[in-house]
């Protein structure tokens, strides 16, 4: 296998990793950093590769929710109150990360984008998820709900308040640190704010659209001169792989959260963080 072919195989592999992990609370960026380091993936485009292949994953979400997305756009433009309120909530949740990201993202990438940080944030994020999911279980012993769920005031996207949406947006800012997980921060942040788990997951999917599109376009704009034709080919391969794998994951996640908690993902994060820390130590 030639070096060029191996380069594209690695890009395809990382695209699969991106699609599988973007919409579950385990940190896709953290996994890309860890697996990219493991397989010695060196892209001349740097972190642009990681951001742009996320477009493949987000387009998968847009495809799955295309009917609801079109309804939202059409309703907002025609002045329908329910759709306008939902659009307002998405914008409120989007702007905190957009503002902080535009100002600090370069410093964040230079400071935090390495496996040691990922190990720490994986463990901390897992512990926080366990805390949220384990807050005083229901008296009937239900395995799929907790007191956090019982206290939820928003059980549908239309019931989310502007304060809850803003709280999700603030939580999303934490996801700029690799290993935190954008989906994990927004879903858990939503649950703490009083949004029911499945609804928080759906809102996280919709919020991913402007957030990830904006991040990808911004990174491309800032680094377009650094991209070579070789890098663009690798990005295209990773993009397609992320799109196809994300198509499978999004539907599976929606089915999963209807009947399960996120505890399994929390324990996975903790275990992976410990393994990475041990690997770095020895």
UniProtKB/Swiss-Prot annotation:
It is an enzyme of class 3 (hydrolase). GO terms for biological process: cell wall organization; peptidoglycan biosynthetic process; regulation of cell shape; response to antibiotic. Bacitracin is thought to be involved in the inhibition of peptidoglycan synthesis by sequestering undecaprenyl diphosphate, thereby reducing the pool of lipid carrier available. One of its GO terms (molecular function) is undecaprenyl-diphosphatase activity. It comes from Bordetella avium (strain 197N). The chain crosses the membrane at residues 6-26, 45-65, 85-105, 112-132, 200-220, 230-250, 262-282. Its EC number is 3.6.1.27. It catalyses: di-trans,octa-cis-undecaprenyl diphosphate + H2O = di-trans,octa-cis-undecaprenyl phosphate + phosphate + H(+). This is Undecaprenyl-diphosphatase. It holds the Pfam family BacA. It is a multi-pass membrane protein. Its main location: membrane. GO terms for cellular component: plasma membrane. Catalyzes the dephosphorylation of undecaprenyl diphosphate (UPP). Confers resistance to bacitracin. Belongs to the UppP family. It is found in: Cell inner membrane. Keywords: Antibiotic resistance, Cell inner membrane, Cell membrane, Cell shape, Cell wall biogenesis/degradation, Hydrolase, Membrane, Peptidoglycan synthesis, Transmembrane, Transmembrane helix. The gene is uppP.
């Amino acid at each position: 296998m030639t070096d060029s072919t191996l380069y594209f195989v690695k890009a395809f592999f990382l695209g699969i990793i991106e699609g599988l992990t973007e919409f579950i609370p385990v940190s896709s960026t953290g996994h890309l950093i860890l697996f990219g380091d493991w397989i010695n993936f060196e892209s001349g485009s740097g972190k642009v590769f990681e951001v742009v292949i996320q477009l493949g994953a987000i387009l998968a979400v847009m495809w799955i929710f295309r009917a609801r997305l079109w309804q939202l756009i059409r309703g907002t433009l025609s002045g329908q109150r329910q759709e306008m309120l939902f659009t307002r909530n998405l914008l409120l949740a989007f702007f905190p990360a957009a503002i902080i990201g535009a100002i600090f993202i370069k410093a964040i990438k230079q400071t935090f984008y390495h496996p040691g940080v990922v190990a720490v944030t994986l463990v901390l994020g897992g512990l926080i998820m366990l805390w949220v999911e384990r807050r005083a279980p229901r008296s009937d012993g239900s395995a799929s709900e907790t007191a956090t769920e019982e206290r939820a005031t928003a059980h549908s996207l239309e019931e989310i308040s502007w304060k809850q949406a803003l709280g999700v947006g603030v939580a999303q800012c934490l996801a700029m640190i690799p290993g935190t997980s954008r989906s994990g921060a927004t879903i858990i942040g939503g649950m703490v704010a009083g949004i029911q788990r499945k609804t928080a997951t759906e809102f996280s999917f919709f919020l991913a659209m402007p957030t990830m599109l904006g991040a990808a376009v911004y990174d491309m704009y800032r680094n377009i001169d650094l991209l070579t034709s070789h890098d663009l080919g690798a990005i295209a391969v990773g993009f397609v792989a992320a799109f196809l794998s994300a198509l499978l994951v999004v539907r599976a996640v929606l089915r999963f959260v209807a009947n399960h908690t996120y505890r399994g993902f929390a324990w996975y994060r903790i275990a992976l963080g410990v393994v990475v820390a041990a690997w770095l130590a020895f």
